């Protein structure tokens, strides 16, 4: 990617950059007991404490300073973490009378990072789906796109739906408005090639509105990776084919965002 020439700004860079990363993990379980075990397993793997560590790493990667963290594990399942971050260092405001220090300008560049998890399942088909939604919203020069590669590796998803948009404007020293401060033609520009090769991808971009949307679906399908508690060799050929069809349909429905005919 070509570097955008640096422009001298008038005042503070108040462009808001929002990255929304939605990942899906699909699994097949034959019985209600197996389904409950899967949901318990996924709920434990992506508990609030681990999600907090992921978000701390995201904050570190984008050069942000953590101001506050709120986290919660839910019953019966699911977790949420919300983190308030700042581009500048954390500064304690003195209680004494007198002028405030210049560093208190960090109040202008508040940003936040959040994650919510949503385990769910089909009532009849044995399909269980785990979804995690991560939102990284920054104001100032911090770019949330710096953390995209790390987020992809952290969740190793079957399906990814990624949205990025830039809002607001800043000005150069002549008063000329800047509605974006970096080059981008696609979110794929920020995904390493070795990851792009693993996924089928679709872009829907509205360049004049600074809206970028990329959907990703894993190319390689190995039934063993989607069975919880047993292996493909434990299924008859017919069971394996039917299970594969159910899983592929589930993935296609999520990827294309619509219900599809049941061919099983």
UniProtKB/Swiss-Prot annotation:
Cellular compartments per GO CC: cytosol
Residues at the active site: 111, 116, 139
Residue ranges crossing the lipid bilayer per the database entry: none
GO molecular function, one term: adenosylmethionine decarboxylase activity
The reaction(s) this protein catalyses: S-adenosyl-L-methionine + H(+) = S-adenosyl 3-(methylsulfanyl)propylamine + CO2
Superkingdom of the source species: Bacteria
EC number: 4.1.1.50
Pathway(s) where this gene product acts: Amine and polyamine biosynthesis; S-adenosylmethioninamine biosynthesis; S-adenosylmethioninamine from S-adenosyl-L-methionine: step 1/1
Class of enzymatic activity (EC top level): lyase
Cofactor note: Binds 1 pyruvoyl group covalently per subunit.
Pfam families: AdoMet_dc
GO annotation terms (biological process): spermidine biosynthetic process
Keyword annotations from UniProtKB, A to Z: Autocatalytic cleavage, Decarboxylase, Lyase, Polyamine biosynthesis, Pyruvate, S-adenosyl-L-methionine, Schiff base, Spermidine biosynthesis, Zymogen
Site (Cleavage (non-hydrolytic)): residue numbering on this chain: 110-111
PTM per Swiss-Prot/TrEMBL: Is synthesized initially as an inactive proenzyme. Formation of the active enzyme involves a self-maturation process in which the active site pyruvoyl group is generated from an internal serine residue via an autocatalytic post-translational modification. Two non-identical subunits are generated from the proenzyme in this reaction, and the pyruvate is formed at the N-terminus of the alpha chain, which is derived from the carboxyl end of the proenzyme.
Modified residues (Pyruvic acid (Ser)): 111
Cofactor annotation: pyruvate
SUPFAM superfamilies xref list: S-adenosylmethionine decarboxylase
Listed NCBIfam families: SAM_DCase_Eco
Function: Catalyzes the decarboxylation of S-adenosylmethionine to S-adenosylmethioninamine (dcAdoMet), the propylamine donor required for the synthesis of the polyamines spermine and spermidine from the diamine putrescine.
Subunit structure: Heterooctamer of four alpha and four beta chains arranged as a tetramer of alpha/beta heterodimers.
Family statement: Belongs to the prokaryotic AdoMetDC family. Type 2 subfamily.
Protein name, entry field: S-adenosylmethionine decarboxylase proenzyme
Species lineage: Bacteria, Bacillati, Bacillota, Bacilli, Bacillales
Gene: speD
């Amino acid at each position: 990617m070509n570097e955008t020439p640096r422009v001298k700004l008038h005042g503070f860079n108040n462009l808001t950059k929002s990255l929304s990363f939605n990942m899906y993990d699909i699994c097949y379980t034959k019985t209600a007991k197996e389904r409950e075990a899967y949901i318990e397993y996924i709920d434990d793997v992506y508990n609030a404490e681990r999600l907090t560590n992921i978000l701390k790493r995201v904050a570190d990667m984008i050069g942000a300073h953590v101001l506050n963290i709120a986290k919660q594990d839910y019953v019966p399942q699911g977790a949420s973490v919300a983190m308030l971050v700042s581009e500048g260092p954390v500064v304690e405001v003195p209680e004494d009378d007198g002028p405030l220090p210049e560093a208190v300008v960090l109040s202008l560049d508040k940003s936040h990072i959040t994650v919510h998890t949503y385990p769910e399942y089909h009532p009849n088909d044995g399909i269980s789906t785990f979804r995690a939604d991560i939102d990284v919203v920054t104001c100032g020069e911090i770019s949330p796109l710096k953390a995209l590669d790390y987020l992809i590796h952290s969740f190793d998803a079957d399906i990814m739906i990624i949205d990025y948009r830039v809002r607001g404007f800043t000005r150069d020293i002549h008063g000329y408005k800047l509605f974006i401060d970096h080059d981008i033609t696609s979110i794929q520009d920020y995904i390493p090639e070795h990851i792009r090769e693993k996924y089928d991808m679709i872009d829907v971009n509205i360049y004049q509105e600074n809206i970028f949307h990329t959907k990703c679906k894993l190319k390689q399908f190995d039934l063993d990776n989607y069975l919880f508690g047993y292996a493909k060799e434990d299924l008859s050929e017919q069971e394996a084919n039917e299970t594969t069809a159910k899983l592929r349909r589930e993935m296609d429905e999520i990827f294309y965002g619509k219900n599809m005919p049941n061919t099983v």
